Amino acid sequence: PASQLLDSDKTIYYERAAFSIDIPTVFETIMGNKLNLSIVGVRAYNQMNLYSKKSPELFRLAIGFKNQVCCNMCIFTDGYKEDLRVTSTNGLYRAALELFNNFNPARQLQLLHSLGNTTMNEHQFCQILGKMRLYQCLPNYYQRNIPKMLLTDTQINSVAKAYINDENFSSFGEDINMWKFYNLLTGANKSSYIDSFLDRSLNTTKLALGINAALHGDERYKWFID
């Protein structure tokens, strides 16, 4: 019976594990920051049915770029598989190769470079943070008409603090470029649990690129800057 199990005998269902493999021979420099190609994987028991012997094993796998200045991860849609279910190591190998082959690093680096070409003033920055805080309180029907924003209130507060104090990306008292803004978002995401880290990494990329486009007149993320 479970009541007679020692602590060392008990299975901990909320255990999470992650790995990160850098490929330093594939790199790019953006705004003075070196980015290495990186492969990241997550395994979370709390998202699996541990009682079933025949159910596929669940993994999350991503390939993207890691900012070597701060270890922030840049994840893109074509480089992320959030629900990779396999029944063998061969299946995992094939799924990983398929993900890697579909990833377009040149396109993603071009998008990251473009962030450095756009700046916003302090008022615009505060407006965006205010909208991000407001997003959390919106009714579900309203949120459905706005692009997703997955950062928590605590993480948004971290973005505000880093804007003032971060040694690499602070811009207090001056205009902030979108590359720095993006890294404030990805930096705040490092406080996420392992099993939500990659989802939020992708979301911060979409947010930064979407808000960048909105500053140039695009409508989709316009709500965050209005």
Language model: regions and residue ranges:
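Intrinsically disordered, low-complexity regions enriched in serine/threonine
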Residues: 5-226
